[in-house]
C-alpha cells in the first residue's frame, strides 16, 4: 500500500513538474510574441494599459454635442440638387509654354452614389485601358537634341515666329521705354543694327504731330499780336529749338522782341509788358528776371500750357537758328543724335544752364563737331543714318572719356568744325573757373564762348562716361543672350527714360507749316534787302513796303581832250594837195647824218707790279714749305 501511495505521489509530482514546465514554455513563447509585436508595431500592450472609465455625465454631454449632426432639418446639403455641367467635363491643361499643342483630358463628373458602386477591379481595368489607349502621356520640354536641331534650322523658325508676331495682339505699353511698343527688333543679328532701329523709333515717338505744331503756332500768334498791340513799332521773333525742329515734348518756346527804336530792354519795359500780358489773360506764373545778363520774362501761356521765355532787343538767336537749319540740312544723323542727347540730359536735370547744365545750342555744336570730325564719316566709310547706334556710343565715349577739356576747345562755323588750343584764345577762357571747362566758339561771334555758363561740366562728363559703360555692357549682354530672352528688352532704355504722356509714332512735321521757321526765313530775307548807311544804322523795311530793284545809273560819256599842237607842227583844218612839211622826211629820219660815232677805247686793266725781289722771296718761302 505504502509503495503504491509513494508511487502515486511521485507520479503526481512528476505531472506537476511537467505542467509547470509547459506553462513556463508557453509563457516564454507568449513573452517572445509580445516582444516581436512591440517591435513591429507601435500599438501599446493590452495588458499594460488600463481602460479609463468615463462618467455618466460626461458621456451624456458628448452625446448631446454629436446629436447636432444628426438633425437633418438644420443641416441640409444645399448642393444635392446641383447637376454636373457638361461644359466643365473637358479641361485644357497647358503643359509648357514652348509646347505647340496642349493636352486635353476628359474629366467626367460622377456622383457619390455612382462612386460607391465602383469596385477595385473596375479601377484596375480602367487604368489598363488608359495604358492601352496611350492616354497616360505627360508632356515635357524639348530635349537637348531637339534644341540643337532647332538651332541648326533657325532661319526657318525665325521666319515662322516673325509671321506669328505680326498677327499677334499688340504688346502692352512699357512705362519706362514705350517707344518699343509693337517695334520689337530683338530678331536683329547685329546688336548695332538693333540699337540704330531703336534710336529711330524713339525719334519718331517724340517727334511732334499735327496737333502739337498747331497748338504752338496758335500760342505764338497770340503773344505776337499782344506785343504789337502794346508796342506798335515792335515785332516778335522765335528762335531756339522750336525754330529748328529740335524740341522735345513739353519744351518751352524762346522768343525775342525787337523794335525800331531799340529801347525795349530796360527794366520798366519788362515789367510793363509782363503786366499787360497778365491783365489780358495771356500769361500765368509770370516771372521777370531783370538783373540777369540777358533780361527775360518767363511765363506760361494758359490756353496751351506752354512755357515761353521772352527776351528783348537781340538778334543773335535768330541768326543762330538759320545756321543750325543749314547744319541739319547738310549733316545726316544730326537731328537724331541731338534729340537723344537732349533727352538723356533732360532726364538727369543736366540741361538747365542756370544750374550749370548744357544748353541746347551747346549740345548741337557738340554733335555737329563730332559728326564733322569723325574719321569714318570723313572717309565715307559709314553712312550716318544707318549707323546711329555706333555713333551714339562713340559720342558718349569721346565726351565722357577721351576729350581733353583742360586744353582743347571747339570751333564751329557755317560749314566746318575744328579743334582749337584754348591757350591761343584767351578771350574765350576769360572769367572761367579753372581750366577744366568746355569752350565752344560762337559761329556768329568768334570772341564769344557759348558754353561759358556750363560750370557743371564734371557731372556732365561723368554722365556721358556712365552712358558709354551702360550701353556697351547692355550690348554685350544681349548679344550673348538667346532670342527667347531678347523679346521685350531695350538697349536704349538703359540710358533713356521717358515719363511723359502716352504718344503715338506720328511724325507729322511735313503736314503742317511751322510758323516759327517760316517767319524766321522771312526775317532773313528782309535783312538781306537792308541798305546799310552806316555800320550801326539800318533801315527797316516792313512787309507792306513795295521793294523794287532800281537799274544802275548809266555812266556819262566824257569827250577826250584834244592834244596840244607841237611848236614845229602846223595843223591845218583843210589841208591842200600841195602840202609840204616844214622838214623833209630824210632829215627827220637822219638818213643824211654822217657816221661820227667813235667808241671810247677800252681802258687797260690795272695789274699790280711786283719787283723781282718780292717774287724771289715768295717762291723761296713756297719751296721751304714743301
Curated annotation (Swiss-Prot):
Belongs to the DNA polymerase type-B-like family. It holds the Pfam family PAP_assoc. Residues 387-448 form the PAP-associated domain. Catalytic subunit of the TRAMP5 complex which has a poly(A) RNA polymerase activity and is involved in a post-transcriptional quality control mechanism limiting inappropriate expression of genetic information. Polyadenylation is required for the degradative activity of the exosome on several of its nuclear RNA substrates like cryptic transcripts generated by RNA polymerase II and III, or hypomethylated pre-tRNAi-Met. Polyadenylates RNA processing and degradation intermediates of snRNAs, snoRNAs and mRNAs that accumulate in strains lacking a functional exosome. Residues 38-49 have a biased composition (Low complexity). Residues 18-37 have a biased composition (Basic and acidic residues). This is Poly(A) RNA polymerase protein 1. It catalyses: RNA(n) + ATP = RNA(n)-3'-adenine ribonucleotide + diphosphate. One of its GO terms (molecular function) is ATP binding. It comes from Eremothecium gossypii (strain ATCC 10895 / CBS 109.51 / FGSC 9923 / NRRL Y-1056) (Yeast). It comes from the Eukaryota. Its EC number is 2.7.7.19. Residues 1-14 have a biased composition (Polar residues). Component of the TRAMP5 complex. Residues 1-62, 590-626 are annotated as: Disordered. CDD domains: NT_PAP_TUTase. SUPFAM superfamilies: Nucleotidyltransferase (SSF81301), PAP/OAS1 substrate-binding domain (SSF81631). Keywords: ATP-binding, Cell cycle, Cell division, Magnesium, Manganese, Metal-binding, Mitosis, Nucleotide-binding, Nucleotidyltransferase, Nucleus, Transferase. It is found in: Nucleus, Nucleolus. PANTHER family: INACTIVE NON-CANONICAL POLY(A) RNA POLYMERASE PROTEIN TRF4-2-RELATED, POLY(A) RNA POLYMERASE.
